[in-house]
């Protein structure tokens, strides 16, 4: 019987086989040795009806820790933030939902304007001159920034702070290996980049120095001091930054950063089990023609009306092929739109207030932990994350907390041996006083 959604008949199969010059399916796979071919039936359950399937999938999904029912103190690069309701409404519109950055851009003015607004807001937040249409995520944005630096300076050494997100450093290592670049980690001291070590490592072979602001431990790096060291040898200064924090902190561009990158996830993008998210990439005019990804520019048409185009396309793969600045194409256009809508809905004052609440609530949580007898490991200023010495395995604590509908902080021992039994606690604007107090009390009872 012919399936309504699988219309291929035996005649169709026969015609296709004849077209490619074989008689049977077995002959088609004749180059695969008999000894490794699968014989028999796949152990697949019988097909379910749509209602049965929906019920089973719902039961499976119910096992997840839903952030509507759990209080999350887990950050480490992915955060539980408020997303205005309008975000889902806009990105669900059909003209955006299946968006593809066009090669004939004039036909998609709405899509191009949305990307242009994203670029503009990223520039305003970071204090930079130009931003691209988005990257895959913060990790790949960081690696692409390092590749830009290596290509521009023609130097082979990359210095990266050990206080940069471990997963971003891993992505950097992958990119660097293919380009025969050397990656050197700079130790951290008291939760921030060790400036003495950095000073000793920066020389005329260094393409760039990469730091995170706020860094992986939540601490605010001293960008002014780092910039002086970096630019002494004409290396590039790359800063990875949580864009929400820039609603309260001085933008990296004000400290002389050459490239600012990061992940726009805090703006309107759910945690989504770690992705997909949306990287951003901003730089100065000096590197405008070396920036990866797509750039949308504003112009006027023959009637003098405002319009948008994909500009500086000679950098891109559909023109330069293997000599392109990157192979990024449509990438995260939909998530970039979500970030744009969220930032627009919040407005400048809303972003500042959201950042202020992160700082205020994180400071309250820190004081509560200290009052309960916990040691907060680093004393420096921080944004919305800080490190707590738990004196026992973090996994054991989190296993207990999850039973109380609390998602505990990140286990730093996974990435830093010296910080075994230390928890990275994230406190966003969504956390209430009651939730913070419950977390501290539950952890105090486990001690």
Curated annotation (Swiss-Prot):
EC number(s) reported in the record: 1.4.4.2
Enzyme class: oxidoreductase
Keywords recorded for this protein, A-Z: Oxidoreductase
Catalytic activity, as annotated: N(6)-[(R)-lipoyl]-L-lysyl-[glycine-cleavage complex H protein] + glycine + H(+) = N(6)-[(R)-S(8)-aminomethyldihydrolipoyl]-L-lysyl-[glycine-cleavage complex H protein] + CO2
SUPFAM superfamilies: PLP-dependent transferases
InterPro entries tied to this protein: GcvPA, GDC-P_N, GDC_P, PyrdxlP-dep_Trfase, PyrdxlP-dep_Trfase_major, PyrdxlP-dep_Trfase_small
UniProt superkingdom: Bacteria
One protein family per Pfam: GDC-P
GO BP, sorted A to Z: glycine decarboxylation via glycine cleavage system; nucleoside metabolic process
Single Gene Ontology MF annotation: glycine dehydrogenase (decarboxylating) activity
PANTHER family: GLYCINE CLEAVAGE SYSTEM P-PROTEIN (PTHR42806), GLYCINE DEHYDROGENASE (DECARBOXYLATING) (PTHR42806:SF1)
Similarity comment: Belongs to the GcvP family. N-terminal subunit subfamily.
Record note on quaternary structure: The glycine cleavage system is composed of four proteins: P, T, L and H. In this organism, the P 'protein' is a heterodimer of two subunits.
Role description: The glycine cleavage system catalyzes the degradation of glycine. The P protein binds the alpha-amino group of glycine through its pyridoxal phosphate cofactor; CO(2) is released and the remaining methylamine moiety is then transferred to the lipoamide cofactor of the H protein.
Protein name, as recorded: Probable glycine dehydrogenase (decarboxylating) subunit 1
Source species of the chain: Bacillus mycoides (strain KBAB4)
Gene: gcvPA
């Amino acid at each position: 019987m012919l399936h309504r959604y699988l219309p291929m008949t035996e005649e169709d199969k026969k015609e296709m086989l004849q077209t490619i010059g074989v008689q049977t399916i077995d002959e088609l796979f004749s180059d695969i040795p008999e000894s490794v071919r699968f014989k028999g039936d796949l152990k697949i359950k019988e097909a379910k009806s749509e209602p049965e399937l929906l019920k089973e999938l719902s039961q499976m999904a119910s096992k997840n820790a839903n952030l509507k029912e759990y209080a999350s103190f887990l950050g480490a690069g992915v955060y539980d933030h408020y997303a205005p309701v309008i975000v889902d409404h806009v990105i669900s519109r059909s003209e955006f939902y299946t968006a593809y950055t066009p090669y004939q851009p004039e036909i998609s003015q709405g899509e191009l304007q949305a990307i242009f607004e994203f670029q503009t807001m990223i520039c305003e937040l970071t204090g930079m001159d130009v931003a691209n249409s988005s990257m895959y995520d913060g990790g790949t944005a960081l690696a692409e920034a390092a590749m830009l630096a290596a290509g521009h300076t023609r130097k082979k050494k990359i210095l990266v702070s050990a206080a940069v997100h471990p997963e971003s450093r891993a992505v950097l290592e992958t990119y660097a290996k293919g380009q025969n670049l050397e990656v050197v980690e700079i130790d951290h001291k008291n939760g921030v980049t060790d400036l003495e070590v950095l000073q000793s490592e920066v020389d005329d072979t260094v393409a760039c120095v990469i730091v995170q602001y706020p860094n992986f431990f939540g601490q605010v790096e001293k960008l002014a001091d780092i910039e002086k060291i970096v630019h002494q040898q004409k290396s590039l200064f790359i800063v990875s930054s949580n864009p929400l924090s820039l609603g309260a902190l001085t933008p990296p561009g004000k400290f002389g950063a050459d490239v600012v990158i990061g992940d726009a996830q805090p703006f309107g993008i759910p945690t989504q089990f770690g992705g997909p998210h949306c990287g951003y990439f901003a730089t100065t005019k000096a590197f405008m023609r070396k920036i990866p990804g797509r750039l949308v520019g504003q112009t006027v048409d023959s009637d003098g009306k405002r319009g948008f185009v994909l500009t500086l396309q000679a950098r891109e793969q559909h023109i330069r092929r293997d000599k392109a600045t990157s192979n990024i194409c449509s990438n995260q256009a939909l998530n970039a739109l979500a970030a744009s809508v969220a930032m627009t809905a919040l407005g400048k004052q809303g972003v500042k207030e959201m950042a202020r609440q992160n700082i205020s609530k994180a400071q309250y949580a820190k004081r509560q932990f200290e009052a309960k007898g916990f040691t907060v490991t680093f004393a420096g200023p921080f944004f919305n994350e800080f490190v707590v010495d738990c004196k026992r395995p973090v996994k054991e604590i989190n296993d207990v907390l999850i039973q109380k509908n609390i998602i505990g902080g990140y286990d730093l021992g996974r990435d830093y041996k010296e910080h075994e039994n230390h928890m990275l606690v994230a406190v966003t604007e969504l956390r209430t006083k009651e939730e913070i107090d419950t977390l501290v009390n539950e952890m105090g009872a486990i001690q």
